[in-house]
Design a protein with these regions (language model features):
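Winged-helix/helix-turn-helix nucleic-acid-interaction surface
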Residues: 65-128
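Short acidic DE-rich linear segments
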Residues: 132-133
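Short recognition helix of helix-turn-helix/winged-helix DNA-binding domains
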Residues: 1-65, 72, 94
Length: 133
């Protein structure tokens, strides 16, 4: 019974996967919700999605400014990369479009996080040694 329910869910694509190690990154709730939403709507073949701040804000229940702030922190952490898009109106003028989000390989972000933690630990150890002298 359970296997058939799983197979049915797979056909409906009513779910998405997040790596378990996402919890190692110590994302705050804003970063987590936004990252999870971007994973949910990404094109699984290209690892990209195009969505506006207001759309994300409505989906996760945060203010637009909060979404913009934490999208930047997700970029700094190496989880996503954003790219501006443009479109041409009917009268021929170029306008800014929504951001295109590139979901970056999770392993790289996790490795970067661990390297940062190791560097902080080494710095703290060096400070303790200097204090002891």
């Amino acid at each position: 019974m359970l296997a058939s329910q799983y197979a049915q869910s797979m056909k409906q694509k009513n779910f998405f996967l997040l790596p378990n190690s996402v919890f190692e990154l110590n994302l705050n709730k804003y970063e987590f919700y936004i990252y999870a939403y971007l994973i949910r709507i990404e094109d699984r073949r290209t690892y990209q999605c195009i969505v506006s701040y207001p759309t994300i804000a409505e989906a996760v229940g945060f203010a637009v400014n909060t979404v913009a702030k934490y999208v930047r922190t997700l970029e700094e952490r190496g989880l996503i990369r954003t790219e501006r898009t443009e479109f041409v109106t009917k009268d021929g003028r170029k306008r800014n479009g929504c951001l295109r989000y590139h979901i970056l390989p999770f392993r790289q972000a996790l490795d970067r996080h661990r390297e940062r933690q190791l560097a902080e630990l080494e710095l703290a150890t060096a400070r303790q040694r200097a204090k002891a002298k």
